[in-house]
């Protein structure tokens, strides 16, 4: 395997060296993509909807986390109101249509459908009505709905009852919830995504504690009162994969034949680059990809976790039964790929004295600079360095490693710091974002030309919104939200650029 990986790296290096970068002023056009290619924006329920105590919605773990631990969120903010898309969805869909977008990715709030998390606790008909109205509005405006079933906001009731995704009891409850969604919305929804970024939910929620439910080992820096960073992330990821497979099975058996839809999962990965041209760093780079991307892609395409994870994590990594492995292998019609940034990777030695943790298990060290130069321009968020070529490299890696699956880029975007000293006119000038999308679309188009089966691209995001631990301190939107004046929406220059792109 190691020899194959080294040969792959050499092949990628040779192909990369022959590639030209996008030239300044070079134009990327909609006409360079297939006619049936989807262009949309992505969102999630907790970040957009607000109305957390309206319409029969039950509490989610994010309601609990933001209110119990405001110190973990920038400015102690929360998503109680967010950008109020619950009440303003018609206005928002109108903005999409005006831009010329033909798709919209949003998530259903599990506790808005099942306030107590379980079927036995009752179905919230108001929640079903809201999503029916949103779906109908999208379709009436020619916008294809891509619906995510889980974007991190699991019901607080299940967290209290059995620990949420730490328990395999979640599989049956998630299946029941998904079954309702397929039954109620599947006649119009043709693209389903089971989970958004199971890596982020597992790591942020259970390894470093920066996301809900905020668990990690006490040795960490995040001040967690409960958790085990060496075990819980692997358990939670495992249960998400089992729940995903169970939901895909029920969709294929009960609904897909009649509804003619597709189902997949959205996986996030950084692109990884060896820090030095050494055997150690090249092997470490493969391990880094395994521990972020292969952790989910290997089970989905091969039925088991990467060998590197089995070797290094040992008995802390759960095992699939033969039946589970068979159910997970091939349990997708498409892969959603979320890409934002890249990292240099160094190999490290095993420290027998260190506490077991996901962050050290891969024996890798991430770097954002080499020889005093950053890997790319730094964006608003501390973790986001702009590296456009990485999206092409990750797509080509997926084609070579995982048998060229159908892919939708389900998230790609960049943020700026929310600078309250800027005037509204100044805040709408986002040339960095225009260049970000221009460069990334250029590299997606290059991947297409090299045979990658990419069929859509979703920008993150249509609007500025609640950005998890960053709260409202950063802005990812192509449209500006005025948090001081009734959440009014204003198009940034990137919105106008995207509109022009879609009409060329």
Swiss-Prot record:
S-S bridge residues: 216-224
Binding residue positions for a beta-D-glucoside: 47, 151, 196-197, 340, 411, 460, 467-468, 476
Active-site residues per Swiss-Prot or TrEMBL entry: 197 (proton donor), 411 (nucleophile)
Glycosylated residues, chain numbering: 75, 329, 371, 421
Reaction catalyzed: Hydrolysis of terminal, non-reducing beta-D-glucosyl residues with release of beta-D-glucose
Domain of life: Eukaryota
Single Gene Ontology BP annotation: carbohydrate metabolic process
Signal peptide: 1-18
SUPFAM superfamilies: (Trans)glycosidases
Keywords, ordered alphabetically: Disulfide bond, Glycoprotein, Glycosidase, Hydrolase, Signal
Record GO terms (molecular function): beta-D-fucosidase activity; beta-galactosidase activity; beta-glucosidase activity
EC number: 3.2.1.21
Record-stated family: Belongs to the glycosyl hydrolase 1 family.
Protein known as: Beta-glucosidase 24
Species of the source: Oryza sativa subsp. japonica
Phylogenetic classification of the source organism: Eukaryota, Viridiplantae, Streptophyta, Embryophyta, Tracheophyta
Gene: BGLU24
């Amino acid at each position: 395997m190691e020899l194959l990986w080294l040969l792959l790296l050499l092949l990628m290096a040779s192909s990369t060296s022959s590639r030209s970068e996008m030239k300044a002023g070079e134009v990327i056009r909609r006409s360079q993509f297939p006619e049936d290619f989807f262009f949309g924006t992505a969102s999630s329920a907790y970040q957009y909807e607000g109305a957390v105590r309206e319409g029969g919605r039950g509490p989610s773990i994010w309601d609990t986390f933001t209110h119990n631990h405001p110190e973990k969120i920038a400015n102690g903010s929360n998503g109680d109101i967010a950008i109020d898309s619950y009440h303003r969805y018609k206005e928002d869909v109108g903005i999409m249509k005006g831009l010329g977008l033909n798709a919209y990715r949003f998530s259903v709030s599990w506790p808005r459908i099942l306030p107590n998390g379980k079927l036995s606790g009752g179905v919230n008909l108001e929640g079903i009505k809201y999503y029916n109205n949103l779906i109908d509005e999208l379709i009436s405006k020619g916008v294809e709905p891509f619906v995510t079933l889980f974007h991190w906001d699991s019901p607080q009731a299940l967290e209290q009852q059995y620990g949420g995704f730490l328990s395999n009891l979640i599989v049956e409850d998630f299946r029941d919830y998904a079954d309702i969604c397929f039954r109620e919305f599947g006649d119009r929804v043709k693209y389903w995504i089971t989970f958004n970024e199971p890596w982020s939910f597992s790591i942020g929620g259970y390894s470093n504690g920066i996301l809900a439910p905020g668990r990690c080992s006490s040795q960490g820096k995040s001040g967690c009162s409960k958790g085990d960073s060496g075990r819980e992330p692997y358990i939670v990821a495992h249960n998400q994969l089992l729940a995903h497979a169970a939901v895909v099975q029920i969709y294929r058996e009960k609904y897909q034949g009649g509804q003619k839809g597709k189902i997949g999962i959205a996986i996030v990965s950084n692109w990884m680059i060896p820090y030095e041209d050494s055997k150690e760093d090249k092997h470490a780079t493969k391990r880094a990809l395994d521990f972020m991307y292969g952790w989910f892609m290997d089970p989905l395409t091969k039925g088991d976790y990467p060998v590197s994870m089995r070797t290094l994590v040992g008995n802390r990594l759960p095992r699939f039964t033969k039946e589970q492995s068979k159910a997970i292998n091939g349990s997708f019609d498409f892969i959603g790929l979320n890409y934002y940034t890249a990292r240099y990777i160094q190999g490290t030695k095993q420290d027998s004295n260190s506490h077991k943790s996901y962050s050290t298990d891969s024996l890798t060290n991430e770097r954002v600079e080499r020889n005093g130069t950053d890997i790319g321009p730094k964006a608003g968020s501390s973790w986001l360095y702009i590296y456009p070529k990485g999206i092409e490299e990750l797509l080509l890696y997926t084609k070579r490693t995982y048998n060229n699956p159908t892919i939708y880029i389900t998230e790609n975007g960049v943020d700026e710091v929310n600078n309250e000293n800027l005037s509204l006119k100044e805040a709408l000038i986002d040339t960095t974002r225009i260049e970000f999308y221009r460069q990334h679309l250029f590299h997606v188009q290059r991947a297409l030309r090299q045979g990658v089966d990419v069929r859509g691209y979703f920008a993150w995001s249509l609007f500025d919104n609640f950005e998890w631990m960053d709260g409202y301190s950063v802005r990812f939107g192509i449209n500006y939200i005025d948090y001081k004046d009734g959440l009014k929406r204003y198009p940034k220059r990137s919105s106008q650029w995207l509109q022009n792109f879609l009409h060329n």
